Amino acid sequence: MKGLRLIATGGALPGRTVTNEELSRTVDTSDEWITTRTGIQTRHYCTEGENAATLAVAAAKQALQRSGLAPADIACCVCATLSAPDATPSVACQVQAALALPENRPALDVNAACSGFLYGTAVARGLLATLGGRYALVIGTEALSRLMDPADRSTCV
């Protein structure tokens, strides 16, 4: 988007790695079938205590550290997710609290599935323009392993 620049990234993965071979023991599929059609060999499932918010906090901490910015520099926090662990507080508000971002700055979630991060970036751009801020924290996080049926081949593969 014109006028925006990415200055740092962060990342976090859930703790459990699930292979195609493991999936083939519970649903009608094979490693070869999955790999040939999707290229996927492993996926990550949340373990106890992990969810979209905990992953967002971990990734955001890493991004903030890499950016060299202080929490006070962040004008807004926008989190793109469709798998928030709770309706309220929003994942963005949980990140805001965990990173000690200023409480008087906007923190909100955007629910737009696969395109969520792009929409979140557009929302952050609008907030920066409106608020006069310089830096936004935009997060994309999902914990779909919490929502899917591990016995349903159409969603677990």
Spans of model-derived segments:
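Short hydrophobic segments within beta-strands
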Residues: 7-9, 80, 139
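Conserved beta-strand segments that form the floor/walls of ligand-binding pockets within enzyme
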Residues: 5, 78, 109
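Active-site pocket-shaping loop/turn-to-helix segments
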Residues: 38-58, 83, 108-115, 153-157
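Acyl-thioester C-C bond-transforming condensing/cleaving domain
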Residues: 25, 65-71, 85-157
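Short glycine-rich or small-residue beta-strand-to-loop segments that form or flank ligand, phosphate
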Residues: 75-82
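Conserved "HGTGT" condensation-loop signature of ketosynthase/thiolase-family condensing enzymes
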Residues: 1-75, 97-99
